Amino acid sequence: MQDSLYVALSAQMALERRLDTIADNVANANTVGFRATGVKFEDMVSGTGQKSVSFASSGKTYLSGAHGSLSETGNPFDFAIQGDAWFAIDTPAGTVMTRDGRFSMNENGELMSIEGHPVLDAGGAPIQLDPRNGPPKAGADGSLRQNDQLVGSIGLYNFDPGENFVRYGNSGIVPARTPEPVTDRSDVGIAQGFVEESNVNPVLEMTRLIMVQRAFENTAALMRQTASSSDEAIKTLGSKS
């Protein structure tokens, strides 16, 4: 009987974590470059044979690899990645990966992220433009030109976010391992004048929310029923003694 209570409790803890991720996804449905979080659950078995009991794990988080849709802005400092890669920005937390390409040029000619951090090239150095020559023209390969002169290139990187990754700012991800620059850009490109929208599907997330809430309610009912049965058993044993 206690096993049922423990199983229900473990399921409830797992559902709470799923609720947290759904709430975060829904809150960022309109965040440029945001990648949704998912949770994978696994059964953990305690005991052996007929006495074995399966418990729900707390879950492992993962980052959705689905691409968000591209929206045209016409802003020459807006960039969207086409393919599997990330921009790199230099922050107080170290190098951060992001798909948010809303950049700008400061008075010193540095290409900056929406949050005011330097955007890095493929070598990991801040991108330096000439502030006197206006917005650059970007090639699909990320090359940047001013007055028809090559002045730099936007770095594109790949990395494994792993489990329990750390978010930074609006849509940044702090990599657990050093990201690798993309050297073969045949399947990866940059679109100037576009941004990538959040890849969160609000309708799908709300459907998941309803399902999780129902499962949570069913689990709570099971816990109440188990506790009630336990109380009845104790009373019965007490009356017999």
UniProtKB/Swiss-Prot annotation:
The basal body constitutes a major portion of the flagellar organelle and consists of five rings (E,L,P,S, and M) mounted on a central rod. The rod consists of about 26 subunits of FlgG in the distal portion, and FlgB, FlgC and FlgF are thought to build up the proximal portion of the rod with about 6 subunits each. InterPro entries: Flag_bb_rod_N, Flagellar_basal_body_rod_CS, Flagellar_FlgE/F/G, Flg_bb/hook_C_dom, FlgE/F/G-like, FlgF, LlgE_F_G-like_D1. It holds the Pfam family LlgE_F_G_D1. The gene is flgF. NCBIfam families: FlgEFG_subfam, flgF, PRK12642.1. This is Flagellar basal-body rod protein FlgF. SUPFAM superfamilies: Flagellar hook protein flgE (SSF117143). GO terms for biological process: bacterial-type flagellum-dependent swarming motility. Signal peptide: none annotated. Keywords: Bacterial flagellum. It comes from Mesorhizobium japonicum (strain LMG 29417 / CECT 9101 / MAFF 303099) (Mesorhizobium loti (strain MAFF 303099)). The keyword Signal does not apply. One of its GO terms (cellular component) is bacterial-type flagellum basal body, rod. Belongs to the flagella basal body rod proteins family. It is found in: Bacterial flagellum basal body.
